[in-house]
Amino acid sequence: MKYICFWEFKPEDFDKMIEKYKQAMEGREKVPEKFPKILFGPYSLGGEWKGFTVYEDATPEQMTNLILHYTPEEKMKFVPIFEGAKFIEIYMKMKK
């Protein structure tokens, strides 16, 4: 399953966030299964201190590890995302 993670932080925490991001990337190299696999991103929303990242096959433990790594500076919200064609297929089966 894929998840989109919306994140945001305060401008005054930007230096801390850069350091935490570097630590997370190094951690991914050493222990790849600690955090969810990045499918694409992170992307920031223009002119704002927030953005999103899409993760693939994220387990609850990996999501928790990621949240705890960036806490308290960053707020995160994980939302499952579905392929439109698959969603329609399941919906049509349910209608029968």
Task: Explain the meaning of each model-derived region.
Residues 1-50, 58-62, 83-96:
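Short S/T/G/P-rich N-terminal loop/turn motif that feeds into the first structured element of a domain
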Residues 50-52, 75:
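Short active-site oxyanion
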Residues 73-84:
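Conserved short beta-strand edge segments in small beta-sheet-based binding/regulatory domains
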Residues 24, 63-72:
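Short amphipathic alpha-helices in soluble, non-transmembrane regions
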